[in-house]
Every structure is written in C-alpha cells, then in structure tokens.
Amino acid sequence: MMLRAVFRRASIRGSSSASGLGKSLQSSRVAVSAQFHSVSATETLVPRGNHAHSFHHRSCPGCPDCSRTIINGYQGTALQRWVRPFSSDSGDVVEAVVPHMGESITDGTLAAFLKKPGDRVEADEAIAQIETDKVTIDIASPASGVIQEFLVKEGDTVEPGNKVARISTSADAVSHVAPSEKAPEKPAPKPSPPAEKPKVESTKVAEKPKAPSPPPPPPSKQSAKEPQLPPKDRERRVPMTRLRKRVATRLKDSQNTFALLTTFNEVDMTNLMKLRSQYKDAFLEKHGVKLGLMSGFIKAAVSALQHQPVVNAVIDGDDIIYRDYVDISIAVGTSKGLVVPVIRDADKMNFADIEKTINGLAKKATEGTISIDEMAGGSFTVSNGGVYGSLISTPIINPPQSAILGMHSIVQRPMVVGGSVVPRPMMYVALTYDHRLIDGREAVYFLRRIKDVVEDPQRLLLDI
C-alpha cells in the first residue's frame, strides 16, 4: 500500500526526482501513522547525486528525534532504490553441462559423481564421469564454487548440452544440503481384541454311529528328485556398461558379417630376443623408452601388409577399398574393457617412434584418458594375448578391418635345428581374416612374412 501511494502521489505532481519521491514517501507514511496512531519510525531518503546516501529513522510528531544510518553508498536505478532496497544477492549460479563427446557419439551414461552436493570445487575440476561406447569422459566444473545440487542421477542417459549440476560461485557460498531425515515411523496400531461371540448353549444331539474308514491307499512311487538350483541370494545382477555393450555388439556383428577363418604358424623368437638383449640399454639411454618385442612385430606386420596389400583392404558393398596407408590398431585390455588405440602411419615410423607411441597410448587407455580420435580408424590390428599367458587363440576381426594378428606367449620347446634337438623360445601366431576378400594363399604368405622378419630382423635393414 505504501509503494502504490508513493507512485500515485508522484504521478499526480509530475515529479520524477528522488527528492520528490522521498517527500511523497514521508508524507504518505505520516498519514498512515496518524490514521492508526502508530509511533513507528518513518524512512527518509537523503539523495546525493546518483546514490542513496542514508536512511534515517525518525519518530512521529511529539516524539524525541532519534536517527541512525542504515545503509551507505547504495547505488542503482530509481526503481531499484525504491523497490528492492533491502534484498540480498544470493550469488551467481553456474551450471555444468555435458561436453561434446565426438562426431560419432550422441549420448552417454552418467557413470559416477566424483563430488557430492556441498563440496567445494575449482574451475575445470572433474565432478562427474560419463561412460560412452568407446571412452570415459569427465564433466568439469565451469567455475570455482560450491556444488548446490545435481540435476541428473547415476545411470541416466545424457546428451551433449544437458545440465548436470548447479554450482554457486558467490564468495560466501555454503552448502544448502541438509542431511536426509527419515520421517518418524508411526507405531503400528495394536490389533483390537477379537469380539467375543455370544455363548450359545448347545443341546446334545444323538450321535450317529461312525462309518468304517476306507483302507489307506498304497504308497506312491517316488519320482526322481529335481536338481536343486542355487539360491538367488548367491547371484548378483549387474547392468552392462556401455563399453561392454558396444564391444559385444561389434564382435557379434563381426561374427555375423565376415567369413572368419584363422591360420597359424610358429615363430622362433631367438634372434629378436637376442637383438633386444644386446641393445636395450643403449636404446633406453638414447630414446628414453624401453625396447620391447611389440615394436618388432609392428615392423614385421608393416612389411607383411606391404607385401600382401589385400590384407590391408576392406569390402564396402560391391567394392574393395585398398588403403595406401598403414594404421595399425593395438588391442589394450583395461579394467573397464578392451580398447583399441591406433598407431597412425606406422609404415613411416622406426622402432623408437613405435615404442613411444605404444607406451603413450597404453598409458592413456589404462588411465581412461584416451580420446575418441586416438581410437578411430585403423586398417589392421595386432593383439598380444601372450602378456596374459595365452598359448594359442583365434582372435576376432575388428570391423571395418579385414584381418587381425594374434601374438601369444613365448614357451621353450624342443626344436630340431641342424639335425639336433635344442630348446628354442617359440611363439604361436594366428591370423584371422575375412575369407570373402582374402584367400588362403595370401593369408599363409602374410604369416610367412611375419615369421621371416621376426626370425631374421636384419631383413628390415636390407628390405628383403
């Protein structure tokens, strides 16, 4: 009522100044006080330029003067000074959103929250993780502040741009999250005592003689006992992760699409292991990375792909796409599943470049920080099951590739060398290929080239 009176008086007088408005406010409040015989104080605005300098409490006529300053230096428009003089700013609130996750990824599952409501976070600090078909992506806080609330739940499907959390960035931000309080359980009402049935005096009835009971039936034949199923409380049902779903779908598609066939060979690892043992210290000192066996097989695979380019090709509809580059994927097992990062232009790399690239990609894959771009593409895959102790296996093709090489564990076996039986470090290698595109002859030649280069690495120097 006071505010409407102020604006009504100001509009009638045609005055828009702060001082005129202040007088209107004072006169209207005095009138109200006189009507209700109130002794409450009135507010008077003392303008100074474009700032409200102070408010004073003054008593009504006949009361002693008593004044004190309420606020100093309040700045704003005339409407703000009169409409919201005592409101407090609750602070800025920013919202954390789902980032862009790659060209081929449209959504993901919110896997876990890394913070709780009420926790303080810094700018760019991870507050949640999104699991996609390929990688795990962090959601970062856009600014420093305190998490007020989360707008989604774990397990929800989210898309780029969806809001995930509200974060207060005010200086005195505090958590407004109260501990969950359980509603007091009301005691269950006590059951009322059953109503007593009226007693009825029964008259004695003459008892009839009982009929003779029939003879008991013969015992039935016992059927075979059904097998006891394990109790349900000893089983756990866990939803599949998006990565596991994606792997399952791709492997089944590979099995349904390709004419899978696997051929095997065995490789004598003596010379490659001798080369590694002889130069590993000098290699580490110069390049800052250890010399492993994987780089030797990558170089051998590059040479074999150059000798048999059809293994590096792929069927696309009614066409065959021949790739004039060699991008080799390496299978890396992680706690969350299998990922396959790519070594780009492996045909242009030396041993040191390959080892550095493998170590960097494997570290990112293990830590879950590998990007979508680092796993896209690839023309051929090398999988090393030997690090887990696998003796032999039949790997499955990684679409849209046409072949995959499987390495296995190195085992000392008796071999005939120069007419004598000697122990040799041997490895089985397997090539699974799409028989629609690759004939058995090309597959055998490919594996034979792998065997020749690994058993005699000097071939790489002479290009023979």
Swiss-Prot record:
Keyword Glycoprotein: no
Active-site annotation: 435, 439
Keywords from the UniProt entry: Acyltransferase, Lipoyl, Mitochondrion, Transferase, Transit peptide, Tricarboxylic acid cycle
Cofactor binding, per record: Binds 1 lipoyl cofactor covalently.
Biased composition (Basic and acidic residues): 196-210
GO cellular component, one term: plastid
Protein name: Dihydrolipoyllysine-residue succinyltransferase component of 2-oxoglutarate dehydrogenase complex 1, mitochondrial
Species this protein is from: Arabidopsis thaliana
Lineage, opening ranks: Eukaryota, Viridiplantae, Streptophyta, Embryophyta, Tracheophyta
